Amino acid sequence: MFKFRSVLLSLLTTALVAGFASPGSTGETSPGLVGAWIVTVSRPAGVGKNLLTFSSDGTFFRSGDTHPVLSGGHGAWKRVGDREFDATYIAFRFDENRKWIGSTKTRIHIISGPGDNEFTGVAKVSTRDLQDKEVGTSEVRLQGKRIQVEPF
């Protein structure tokens, strides 16, 4: 009976300790991307702004200054290094009459820093038609700043 209690206590202790570990904890040295960011985008046509929100479950959402010709974007992200992340999102494209004409698939590589609330990145954009055939590509530079809660 004593041995059974010891084993049971050991299992409960292990389960309790495991319960306090954060999901996906890898001993990371930076807080990561989770949160909301305002991003300056250097495009071939000029500088623009995007809002990116990275969720802890690996999904993320993008909205930008290209509305109404580009929808909000939905995508996924993951950590690929200590301060490096890759992400992919898809957004729908519309013409000036708001007719659906295709999509964009954007792949992003982000390096966080120099502080915990900044990042730089590169995005490779694939412009696609209604049959999902690539009809153009471009590359843009990103500079992100974490959106912080400000005192009321």
Q: Where are these predicted regions, by residue range?
A:
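Bacterial N-terminal signal peptides
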Residues: 9-19
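Edge beta-strand at a domain terminus
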Residues: 125-152
